[in-house]
Amino acid sequence: MERFMKNPKGLTTKLLENYDWDYIELPVTVNTEKLMGWYEEVVANNMHSAFIFSADKMTPYVKQRYQPLVSWWLGENTWGAAEQWTLQWPVQHDGVIPSAYLANEEQFPEAMDPDIEKNSVNLDKYFYGAYKEMYDTFPEGTFNVTRLLRFGKDTGLKKHTDVEPPDFLIRMHVQLQSSSGSHWFFGEDLEREYFMEPGKVYLYNTAIPHAAVNRDDDYWVMIHNNPGNSAVDHLLSIDSLHVG
């Protein structure tokens, strides 16, 4: 199996449950002009809701037992702080929302729900325009744990995995804006470098060590989400799709 695949026809979730591939470019494109218009409105109206990846900004929202993890995770990160907006949550919420597994129990009791992914809803303040159009066009179950993420200049994420073997998770990225200085790196030594093109949609293997960095002046902007297995199978079977 190739590390990077552009023709996923014939693949299934079952066939991808291994650690021999990094990411897949789907035959799917999106209207970046429309989505960037939506993104600019979201940022203009909701900076107060951004979860910012820096120790002082994250700590107030993170459960106590993960405080050392935050310090460790960010301590080796020499890049600037990424910003993230959570687009789905079990209740309507207007403030900062961390990743559910990190969330402070007192501030976010709903995050303790073991079925939080199934019980989450789209937050009304984000669910409109080009994003809603895209959401409604993709197969049911595509957009779970959906977040808007951006990297400014010299901003990134250090090497990490999102799950540990034998666990397995496929994540989807919709690229709204990227440029020649924005790259993902995969592998134990981050030896495999990839550029994800604006307007394209990708699946990637979160169990493979990976990191990201943006070296350009422009923001690197994406939507990322965890499609369910049936949605992944549907996405892999698509011949061609343009949204917007």
Per-region residue spans from a language model:
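Non-heme Fe(II)/2-oxoglutarate
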Residues: 1-137
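A short glycine-rich, His/Asp/Glu-containing loop-to-beta-strand
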Residues: 135-155
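A short beta-loop-beta micro-motif enriched in histidine and acidic residues
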Residues: 143-144, 157-171, 189
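Short, conserved beta-strand element in jelly-roll/cupin
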Residues: 150-152, 166-182
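A short hydrophobic beta-strand segment most commonly corresponding to one strand
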Residues: 170-175, 201-203, 216-235
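A short beta-strand-loop-beta hairpin characteristic of the jelly-roll/cupin
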Residues: 175-197
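Conserved metal-binding segment of the jelly-roll/cupin
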Residues: 193-209
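Asparagine-centered strand-capping/turn motif at beta-strand->loop junctions
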Residues: 210-215
